[in-house]
């Protein structure tokens, strides 16, 4: 899910949707309005799920989308290689995530772990 907001209201550390990917804002630079133009903002951000650096330039008064990022808890059901099967603690939704070798080392069946969910994607914190 996502909601609309003005570019001028965004702040560092918050989230924005760029190229249909939820991103965390790293820096914002705003230029002064010119004789015939409006003020513009340059937003540098990093994707939450893919880690790719992205930047956009938009007028301060333009509307943009802000993702709703949810932090939830899940219980580890099983581990098969780098694929972990998890169950959400609140709504008992079952799903699988591919994780790194380092993340698998700290997991064991029955353990509760936090994860991030936004725009239909999920990732371990």
UniProtKB/Swiss-Prot annotation:
Gene3D superfamilies: 2.30.30.30, Nucleic acid-binding proteins (2.40.50.140). One of its GO terms (biological process) is positive regulation of translational termination. The keyword Disulfide bond does not apply. Keywords: Cytoplasm, Hypusine, Initiation factor, Protein biosynthesis. The keyword Ribosomal protein does not apply. Pfam families: IF5A-like_N. SUPFAM superfamilies: Nucleic acid-binding proteins (SSF50249), Translation proteins SH3-like domain (SSF50104). One of its GO terms (cellular component) is cytoplasm. PROSITE patterns: IF5A_HYPUSINE (PS00302). One of its GO terms (molecular function) is RNA binding. InterPro entries: IF5A-like, IF5A-like_N, NA-bd_OB-fold, Rib_uL2_dom2, Trans_elong_IF5A_hypusine_site, Transl_elong_IF5A_arc, Transl_elong_IF5A_C, Translation_prot_SH3-like_sf. CDD domains: S1_aIF5A. NCBIfam families: eIF_5A, PRK03999.1. PANTHER family: TRANSLATION INITIATION FACTOR 5A FAMILY MEMBER (PTHR11673). Functions by promoting the formation of the first peptide bond. This is Translation initiation factor 5A. It comes from Methanoculleus marisnigri (strain ATCC 35101 / DSM 1498 / JR1). The lineage of its organism: Archaea, Methanobacteriati, Methanobacteriota, Stenosarchaea group, Methanomicrobia.
């Amino acid at each position: 899910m996502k909601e609309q907001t003005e570019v001028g209201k965004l702040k560092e550390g918050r989230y924005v949707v760029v190229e249909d990917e939820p991103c965390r804002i790293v820096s914002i630079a705003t230029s002064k309005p010119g004789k015939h133009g409006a003020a513009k903002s340059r937003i540098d951000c990093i994707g939450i799920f893919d880690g790719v650096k992205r930047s956009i330039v938009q007028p301060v008064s333009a509307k943009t989308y802000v993702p709703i990022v949810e932090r939830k808890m899940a219980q580890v059901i099983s581990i098969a290689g780098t694929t972990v099967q998890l169950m959400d603690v609140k709504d008992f939704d079952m799903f699988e995530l591919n994780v790194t070798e380092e993340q698998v080392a700290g997991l064991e069946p029955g353990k509760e772990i936090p994860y991030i969910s936004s725009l239909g994607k999920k990732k371990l914190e």
